[in-house]
From Swiss-Prot:
Pfam families, A to Z: Glyco_tran_28_C, Glyco_transf_28
Protein name as it appears in the record: UDP-N-acetylglucosamine--N-acetylmuramyl-(pentapeptide) pyrophosphoryl-undecaprenol N-acetylglucosamine transferase
Species classification: Bacteria, Pseudomonadati, Pseudomonadota, Gammaproteobacteria, Thiotrichales
Entry membrane topology: Peripheral membrane protein
NCBIfam families, per database record: murG
Gene transcribed to yield this protein: murG
Bilayer-crossing regions: none
Any GO BP annotation: carbohydrate metabolic process
Length: 371
């Protein structure tokens, strides 16, 4: 379908887990000639990323969950104000459809769309549905889920389930391309370990990896590491690697700019279990040891990881159980049996949906055809 003259708003913000899947869909909509505008909040992650690619409008928005009394008292007034601003944006741009990818900013713009009888699609990236999306699911024309999990189904009414579709997480085309390539697991010698401490860093993961390299080597397990530390932990982590022989280090950096290259290089991955990381690593076929962030809302990272574990396509260790012994217990059998590693890699590739953006595009077409 040619979406020429169709005006669509994408709204997502707060974290990369919301923003990057939304960007993948926004790019596909633009390829199909839609006029795409992004609505986010000022002084935010999306404000730093999105304007390079799309026209952006701003509204002030904030959450209420877990906040102090002052924020909770102010929340209704902030919501009313931001919804009124959102209504003006919808009218000015003559919007035909709104797609919300979560984050607080999705609330006001989607509520305003409902008030103006503009259809909305929401997409939930995690295996636990977020508060904003849980509310919007009652109002949405279409509810798209990344994971087919019983917990989300329990939280939705039969009416909401009738308009729900599992579509996976939209990810970048260059990473999807890895799914169609044979994953080259190192046949012998050093196992290539990619460590993602997160863009902001994960101190517990960063601290244990240098010791893991040394202890594994003592047990006859030779690892070569490429470590993203995050900005906050870079200097400390780099210093910790002074005890590790340079032959076991590919690179230590605050941030990896070319994740496609990193996934293609890696034999195995240690990382958090944010929705984007789980989806990208699976599609790329990189067997992962997930260390869920303990403070994640509703423990959603643990449940994200379980989608891989239950399919024998990944591993999960709680942070308080992340010991050298437990890590080596997972890595050693894979080091000794590379065919097993290849098997897990293939299972990871086959676990998640690969054409998520296309499925959302099809939903957009179906809704706009009915208008």
């Amino acid at each position: 379908m040619n979406l020429k003259d169709k005006n669509i708003i994408i709204t997502a913000g707060g974290t990369g887990g919301h923003i990057y899947p939304a960007l993948a869909v926004a790019e596909m909509l633009r390829e199909n000639n839609a006029n795409v505008t992004w609505v986010g909040t000022p002084n935010s992650m999306e404000a730093n990323i999105v304007p390079e690619y799309f026209n952006m409008q701003y509204i002030k928005s904030s959450g209420v969950r877990g906040k102090g009394l002052k924020r909770k008292v102010a929340f209704p007034f902030t919501l009313i104000s931001s919804t009124l601003k959102a209504r003006k944006i919808l009218k000015k741009l003559k919007i035909d459809l709104v797609i919300g990818f979560g984050g607080y900013v999705s609330g006001p713009i989607c509520l305003a769309a409902v008030q103006k009888d503009i259809p909305i699609i929401i997409h939930e990236q995690n295996a636990k549905i977020g508060l904003t999306n849980r509310i919007l699911a009652k109002l949405a024309t279409k509810v798209c889920l990344a994971f087919d999990v019983e917990d989300i189904q329990k939280r939705l009414s039969p009416k909401q389930l009738a308009k729900t579709q599992v579509v996976g997480n939209p990810i970048r085309k260059d990473i999807i391309a890895l799914n169609n390539k044979t994953k080259n697991i190192t046949e012998n010698g050093k196992l290539k370990l990619l460590v993602l401490g997160g863009s902001q860093g994960a101190k517990s993961i960063n601290n244990i990896i240098p010791d893991l390299i040394i202890e594994a080597n003592k047990q006859g397990i030779s690892l070569k590491v490429w470590h993203q530390t995050g900005k906050l932990s870079f200097e400390e982590t780099k210093n910790n690697y002074n005890q590790v022989p340079s032959t076991h280090i590919k690179d230590i950096s605050a941030y990896i700019t070319d994740m496609t290259n990193a996934y293609e290089w890696a034999d195995i991955l240690i990382c958090r279990a944010g929705a984007l990381t789980v989806s990208e690593s699976a599609i790329a076929g990189v067997p992962a040891i997930f260390i869920p962030l303990p403070s994640a809302v509703d423990d959603h990272q643990f449940f994200n990881a379980q989608n891989m574990v239950k399919n024998n396509a990944g591993f999960c260790i709680r942070q308080d159980q992340m010991t050298l012994e437990n890590l080596i217990d997972i890595i050693k059998p894979l080091y000794e049996d590379r065919d097993k590693l290849k098997e897990i890699s293939q299972k990871a590739k086959n676990t998640l949906i690969k054409d998520s953006s296309e499925q959302i595009l099809k939903a957009v077409e179906q809704i706009l055809n009915k208008k």
